[in-house]
Amino acid sequence: MSVRISSRADITLDAVRRVAWEGEGVDLAPEALHRMDEMHASFMALVAARLAEDPGALIYGTTTAPGDGAAVALTPEAQARRPTRLWTAHTFGEPLPDRVVRAIVLARLANFVEGNAAVRSEVASAVAGLLDAPLPTVPAEGNGGSGEILALGRLFYDLSARMDLKPKERMALINGSPCAAALVADIALAGRARLALAEGVFALAVEAARAPLEAYSEDLDGLWDDEHETAALRALRTLLDGGAPVRQAHQGAVSFRILPRVLGQVRRVQTEAEHAAEVSLRSVTDNPVYVLPDDDRPLGTVISTGGYHNARAPAAMDGMGIVWADLCQIAQRLTDKLLQHPSTAGLLARDEWTMKPLHMVATGWAEEARAYAGPTLLSLGGFGQNDVPSMGFLAWRRAEATGRCLDAALAIVAALGAQALHAAGQDPPPALAALVEEIRAAFPPVDGVRPLGPDGNALTAAFGRRVFTGPVAAASA
């Protein structure tokens, strides 16, 4: 299977899922290939016309050097000496997962397919062809430059070494913001599964404690009048339908009652992350960007832009990290609640030897999440023309780490909830039965003293496989 790309509108979040997570290839439509060659020829005609009019015309990266060299046109001798390979492959460190690198390759095509990068079709085909072989290593760390030229230099260096590229094509490979688009898409895809997982695990905790269901009443849908909180209320009602008929008589603890509000906020932030990903993936972000010909400009025009700096993606990833960290705090509170609640304490914490120490593990994961989450502010680093770095990689690393904390924190609550039902001889609500079965397969019921760390690892890994679906994504789960 391949994803057909006819225009940049075809580069969607679902396309990222298929190409980056499932491992499908990319098929560039014939009309897109023709359009790219046509626009490349048009751009070259524009450059020739500008130089004929003014031999010192400044077209960034084509008649000039990059960065601080943008102010002066290159002499013929300097043009002859310019490197034929990419010159920015300098970053190093822990590598990005293959699923993210594949997403970057896909996102790179957005600038190409409608001609705005002025690359030939053979360059776009070579980029798409990278998906059919093992990909270069791209570091997740050390990306502190303006735009994404460091990571993209690592990704496309070998391609530049084996192809005879025009100056604009070399610039087009490393400019723009495909990395930020891919990174926020990766977090958004993971967020969908983590939201469903969190709702299921928290509903299991509600059921184990036999907490009152009035906090999720249908009456609140219209009273709160918020689409995301209403969706959370409905999800919890569905998950808890058919549960134990006898519940706690007085109101539940705050950690139970605020679940729809907190989960509603997660849904709200998830929606923004998905929207940020969709817009980022299809945006033309090249610098300089080729504005296509029209009646007033028959050869088009070329302008320098800041498209390589995606400010929305880091904010969206920060938002996801913050709500995931909040869920870790809720998970820690529910861990303590289940170990102390009158309905479950005797089932889970009747002694000091079995499950009670898990409350300390939950605190550890919650604190790690707190350390990772927060706003990724603009860097004070920079040099010369490149005086403001882009922050997408750091925002992704923080959100990714927070998400891993959430998987572990949810595993603890899930293990306690399933154990409480086991010890009470209580069946879960029908909508939670499959989840409970999955929990017990990785974290069997505890009937005596044993190390629970390996079980926690196994359940966290199982939850990771829920989040990272598809053969490529699963390899990094």
Residue map of PLM features:
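FAD-binding core of FAD-dependent oxidoreductases
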Residues: 58-82, 87-112, 137-159, 165-182, ...
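C-terminal auxiliary extensions adjacent to catalytic cores
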Residues: 2-52, 89, 151-153, 158-477
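Acidic, glycine-rich active-site loops and adjacent beta-strand->loop/helix elements
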Residues: 65-66, 110-111, 131, 144, ...
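Surface-exposed beta-strand edges and their flanking turn/coil or helix-capping segments
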Residues: 74-75, 119-121, 186-188, 425
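Alpha-helical scaffold/interaction cores of sigma-54-like transcription cofactors
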Residues: 1-51, 83-138, 143-144
